[in-house]
Amino acid sequence: MPRPRKSLICLQDTPYYHCISRCVRRAFLCGEDHYSKKSYEHRRQWVEARLIKLGSIFAINVCAYAVMSNHTHVVLHVDRDEALSWTTHEVLKRWHTLHKGTNLTRQYMQAEQRSLLSDSQIESVIATANIYRQRLHDISWFMRLLNEFIAR
């Protein structure tokens, strides 16, 4: 029985992980579908571009990957220390390239708006940034954002 990634990943043991993501119900990720005779080869570039983009945003390096007709293999290196070294501004900038963020985080990113924030609002932004920081070196979030983008 499959186990969730959070119970399989221990960064103290190794920062390198091999992740596999499969298509279901005879769906084709790329290549030619033998049943419908449609070509999905253009999707290979989508997957590659998304991997490169996520690798530049996350504190996760893509060491190797293979995009097969109905699944992908990705070898990842999690650089937790890099994520912990980022400033709050850097974390929010990276997160906002993928997500909208909250009203407070968007205000914080604008220098003229940041000066108007109260101390409690800034504390809230820092707490939110720490959540984002954890996500930006989490393999589950990396794979989620890769697969959701391709599925849509």
Regions found by a protein language model. Give the residues of each.
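Short catalytic/metal-binding and nucleic-acid-binding patches
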Residues: 1-152
